[in-house]
Amino acid sequence: MKLFSLKPVTNSYDMVEWDILSFAEKIQPMLPSNQDACMFLLDIHMNNDSLLEYWPEGYELSFLPGYLKDNYDISIMDGFIALRMNAYEALKDLLAPLGEFIETKADGEPIVIFNLRTFGLEDEAKCEREYLDGYPLDYIKIAFINDDVKNKPVFKSKFTGGSRLYCTDKFKSAVDVVRM
């Protein structure tokens, strides 16, 4: 089994423009009174929180003009996966047990934002971390325990705050089959 790091296509654009600050203002009234919306959104991947329950009814996004030129059906966006409808239809059964689908629109076109809520178990002995003057920085190599991730086509790592996504060859093959 091969594992891959999911990253945006080099020199590409995110699918949608998502103004997180204005979004935070919209969801603040729906959050518990002691929860700051900006902190909630900053920590959503690490805390494995649901976004679906707070998604404002009728909230729409906009396609980024550069994205429309590339016209991909999938966009990896800081811990989320944005899917156009044909990508969603092709991948929904594979992704459904791993997170939540948030149906919305971008410029009137139906799209789905996938909030991954599945962690892979890291193999700490094989992970490598960068240090500066003895202080830990980012991980430069992440390894996972194969028995844990073999049935998780897409997953995230606690070592990266949950915002970097990883996948198995099963997910990669599913994407390749429909050429998204």
Question: Residue locations for each model-derived region?
Answer:
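Phosphate/anion-contacting hairpin/loop surfaces
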Residues: 1-180
